[in-house]
């Protein structure tokens, strides 16, 4: 094949990448946000170099909210936040802000669907009618053992 899309965790994506690279050094590897964690690089090593990944936050962002989250997260967990940490932070902020914006008798769901965007680590988060968040997608590639956001 010319390319392979891995919709797996970081651990499985790293293992698959190693097996694939044993057989084909040239195939393009793509992975979902689920694999976009430091574990991918730790476990995958050279096999994940050049892998292209989807992400909903820019690891290189200079946004003040993301900088604050990074500081607190690193102090507590001794590592940078990944997609799950940022998503949990944004979800919590959205719910707390929606509760503050809610008027007496108003359903939280309705507030979250109609009163966004809500502040997040990088930018505001709003929700569609199904409750899915609307975010700016980012594409990253693994280069020299780091996720680099493509511009």
What are these regions (language model features)?
Residues 1-151:
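Extracytosolic ligand-binding ectodomains
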